Amino acid sequence: MNQSEMMAKIERGDGFIAALDQSGGSTPKALKGYGIEEGAWSNDEEMFDLIHQMRSRIITSPCFANGKVLGAILFERTMDGTVDGKPTPQALIDRGIVPFIKIDKGLEDDDNGVQLMKPIPGLDELLERAKSLGVFGTKERSVINAANASGIAVCVAQQFQLARQVLAAGLVPIVEPEVNIRSADRAESDDLLLTSILEELDEMPDGQRVMLKLSIPAEPGKFQPLIDHPKVLRVVALSGGFSREEACRELARNPGMIASFSRALLSDLRAQQSDSEFDSTLGQAIDEIYSASTAKVLA
């Protein structure tokens, strides 16, 4: 796939984006969920080798390349690794899957109801390396814990400032200001977030487009103005702590929004499964998430 083919697939394709981007802090939890306890490694290198083996197993599973997975978000070390003897982004492209990379370095402590992104040292070099490896876009996450208008405005402004840097590097940013689905004022946060994003989009030059990765809104259809916006390439949903069943049910009530799930995609996979068991389990998850992304129901 060339750049224009990847753009068309992400903009119009039926399917969803797999999030395979657990980073250093969340890797032990991801491995434990996969059936590998902390005693199985003695240093970070061994830990990252284990998580790369898991991701390689996912990427090389026949069902992962069945056309239902449009793209995959990678952790930096996964991007720099190999799958089937090829750089991971190329292995994805060979399977018809568009590669993205997570670029944020974690979250600051809560302030004004939001957790901003920590500084990202060496970002220009990372973006240049990603571009050279065939990566299409980036993903960067911050979190909204309370319906604080000024906090949310600052959070979204930081996201779009970073998005401009990504666009300047020739990549497509996935802007991810996640609303905490457990917060008491989630619906109000959705409203404030929508307003702030629309204001930032209005400031963007014509011809530039971003993607948005958002929590599934408390009110179905709330983010339709973003889905329809000419400066938005695609709106994808995070699972945000929902089970796969819950996340799929909620997502199916939001036309135009597709999944970008991590835990809800991978939760039933185990290192101890045979290849046939692993492929069957992953295939079932892919089918369910694909259906919720493409076959919508009336709210």
Show the residue positions of the predicted features:
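Alpha/beta catalytic barrel-like cores
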Residues: 1-136, 144-146, 196-214, 218-299
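Eukaryote-skewed repeat-based solenoidal scaffolds used as protein-protein interaction platforms
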Residues: 138-212
